[in-house]
């Protein structure tokens, strides 16, 4: 890689991380000590993030283009949803927040991410959930928490990366079943979102960030199956997972932002039975 491009990547990486962390740290140090109610803390931190993320992306010269936001708006007014997206970069959550900035997104992350000293505290304050990936007990507790909070009036706008981790090359990895099991058991629609272009700009475990364009396409929702018996649910979940994964497999290259999404990515909303 040419020396000038390496320097550019470091400079823009500093701009991205520096702005984002500075705003969030100032929020924690100055504002949060005088606020004690968790709901107020979440409100302040989320709005600080919505201010910081566009500024950080602009400083790094990363443009985010979005389509299909109306699908999220419609579901937000009803029973909520589980937003799924492919995952290749730390830019992915920022791009989602930039496009869906008026939606209170609750990200579901690896539990170890929320145990990091400063970052984890910030993410928990934003309302993120941490789930142990390989623990059925932890997943069951998370499902019960979602259902209990829904009964109390909470409309879940959950964000899950069903690959379970970031891709090393930007291309799709196999989906895990847990996301779709949660959708079936909680009767929540799946909202597919295709993110393109983040890996070449800011790859996995990379500090450098290069100027470029990210595209976020929100697609029509997939309705969950109806009420099922214990014997039927696994087949229905497998069908839901297969349908969702086919949307992403239809995209020729997740590292390229040019062109519209092909069918079946743009198929109309339908239920899985």
Predicted regions located by residue number:
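Short acidic-hydrophobic, aromatic-tinged amphipathic segments that line or gate anion-handling sites
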Residues: 66, 129-132, 224
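Membrane-anchoring hydrophobic helices of lipid-metabolizing enzymes
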Residues: 1-81
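A short acidic, often aromatic-flanked loop/helix-cap motif at beta-alpha or helix-coil junctions
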Residues: 71-75, 115, 136-140, 222-228
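Non-catalytic C-terminal accessory region of glycerolipid acyltransferases
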Residues: 3, 7, 140-273
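Catalytic core of membrane glycerolipid acyltransferases/transacylases, capturing the structured
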Residues: 31-50, 59, 75-136
């Amino acid at each position: 890689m040419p020396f000038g491009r390496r320097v550019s990547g470091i400079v823009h990486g500093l701009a991205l991380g520096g702005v984002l962390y500075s705003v969030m740290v100032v929020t924690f140090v100055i504002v949060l000590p005088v606020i004690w109610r968790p709901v107020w803390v979440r409100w302040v931190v989320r709005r600080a993030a919505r201010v910081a993320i566009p500024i950080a992306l602009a400083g790094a010269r990363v443009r985010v283009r979005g389509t299909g936001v109306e699908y999220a708006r419609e579901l937000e007014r009803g029973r909520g949803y589980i937003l799924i997206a492919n995952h290749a970069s730390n830019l992915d959550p920022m791009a989602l927040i930039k496009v869906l900035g008026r939606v209170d997104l609750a990200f579901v992350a690896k539990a170890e991410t929320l145990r990091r000293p400063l970052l984890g505290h910030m993410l928990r304050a934003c309302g993120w959930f941490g789930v142990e990936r390989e623990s059925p007990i932890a997943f069951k507790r998370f499902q019960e928490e979602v259902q209990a909070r829904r009964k109390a009036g909470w409309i879940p706008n959950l964000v899950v990366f069903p690959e379970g981790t970031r891709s090393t090359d930007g291309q799709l990895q196999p989906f895990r079943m847990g996301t779709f099991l949660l959708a079936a058991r909680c009767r929540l629609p799946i909202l597919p979102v295709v993110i393109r272009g983040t890996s070449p700009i800011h790859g996995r475990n990379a500090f450098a960030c290069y100027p470029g364009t990210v595209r976020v396409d929100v697609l029509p929702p997939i309705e969950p199956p109806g009420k099922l018996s214990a014997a039927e649910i696994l087949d229905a979940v497998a069908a839901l997972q297969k349908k969702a994964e086919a949307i992403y497999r239809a995209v020729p290259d997740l590292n390229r932002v040019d062109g519209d999404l092909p069918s079946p990515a743009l198929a109309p909303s339908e239920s899985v039975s």
